[in-house]
């Protein structure tokens, strides 16, 4: 079984800072991590490999420093790592990113064997779009299972996979044929501790580095800014709002008087609310017959 896992190196969101003047993200000095949802995908792929055998290939698109994320994935137990790096990829939005990764996965299939399952995280913590995984599936014509919490089983004979998928209000048990693409949720299983032999093997393993041409991308115009119909116009910090607290003495006061005082205080801070409520005929506190 051949499992391909897409990962991304992202800034540690707990330590991201925004420049107070330019309102841009200050990346200098901010440590990077593997996207948490991608770690969940990697762990699920490694578990399948433990159960059914096979190999796990990790792939990422990014600058040369993204090799650090791939080497970390190798220490967890991945067998092979591919870095897709080229100046043509700079400024890629989700459409251009899914195109480049789909081309790379197709090339991985030609070079190392067709993937049975392609894994991605549900989304990245620096983009939060959840679009790249489905975009890859569409380009590779793969069935897609999104928001997956757990892989329940793989039937090698019938070439089918069964998963538990989170849905609004509960969970779904879904089954589809292989090959397919799965987007994993963070939190299902923590990434394993790498073993010593995995760390030693990772140190000896050479990361495969592909340019756009190496990945079979004949037309770089589909990549990077040229292939991106969307561009981030501005990154900004939310404006702070002064919060006020008001203490009201309710000692030995009837409920009606307390309610009227609270409503008057709210209307004093938000005059527009009084106008809106007045237009619906809802003014003042409701009648209170008794205290309870």
UniProtKB/Swiss-Prot annotation:
GO molecular function, one term: electron transfer activity
Gene3D superfamilies found in the cross-reference section: HUPs
One example of a Gene Ontology biological process annotation: nitrogen fixation
Superkingdom of the organism of origin: Bacteria
Entry keyword set: Electron transport, Nitrogen fixation, Plasmid, Transport
Coiled coil start-end: none
UniProt KW Electron transport keyword: yes
CDD domains: ETF_beta (cd01714)
Similarity field: Belongs to the ETF beta-subunit/FixA family.
Subunit structure: FixA and FixB form a heterodimer.
Summary of the function given for this chain in its UniProt record: May play a role in a redox process involved in nitrogen fixation.
Protein name, per record: Protein FixA
């Amino acid at each position: 079984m051949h499992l391909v896992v897409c990962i991304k190196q992202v800034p540690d969101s707990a330590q991201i800072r925004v420049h107070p003047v330019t309102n841009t993200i200050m990346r200098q000095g901010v440590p990077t991590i593997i996207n948490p949802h991608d770690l969940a995908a990697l762990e699920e792929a490694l578990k399948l490999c433990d159960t059914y055998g096979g190999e796990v290939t990790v792939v990422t698109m990014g600058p040369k420093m993204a090799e650090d994320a791939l080497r970390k994935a190798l220490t967890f137990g991945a067998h092979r790592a591919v870095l897709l790096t080229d100046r043509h990829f700079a400024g890629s939005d989700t459409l251009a990113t899914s195109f480049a990764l789909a081309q790379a996965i197709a090339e991985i299939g030609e070079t190392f064997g067709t993937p049975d399952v392609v894994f991605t995280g549900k989304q990245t913590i620096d983009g939060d779009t959840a679009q790249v995984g489905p975009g890859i599936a569409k380009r590779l014509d793969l069935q897609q299972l999104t928001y997956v919490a757990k892989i329940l089983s793989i039937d090698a004979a019938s070439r089918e996979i069964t998963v538990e998928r989170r849905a609004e209000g509960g969970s779904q048990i879904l089954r589809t044929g292989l090959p397919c693409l799965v987007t994993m949720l963070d939190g299902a299983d923590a990434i394993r501790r790498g073993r010593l032999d995995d760390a030693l093997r990772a140190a000896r393993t050479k990361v495969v580095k592909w340019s756009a041409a190496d990945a079979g991308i004949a037309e770089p115009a589909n990549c990077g800014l040229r292939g991106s119909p969307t561009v981030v116009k501005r990154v900004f910090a939310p404006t702070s709002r002064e919060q006020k607290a008001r203490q009201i003495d309710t000692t030995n006061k009837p409920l009606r008087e307390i309610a009227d005082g609270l409503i008057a205080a709210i209307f004093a801070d938000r005059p527009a609310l009084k106008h809106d409520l007045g237009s619906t005929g809802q003014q003042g506190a409701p009648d209170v017959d008794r205290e309870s």
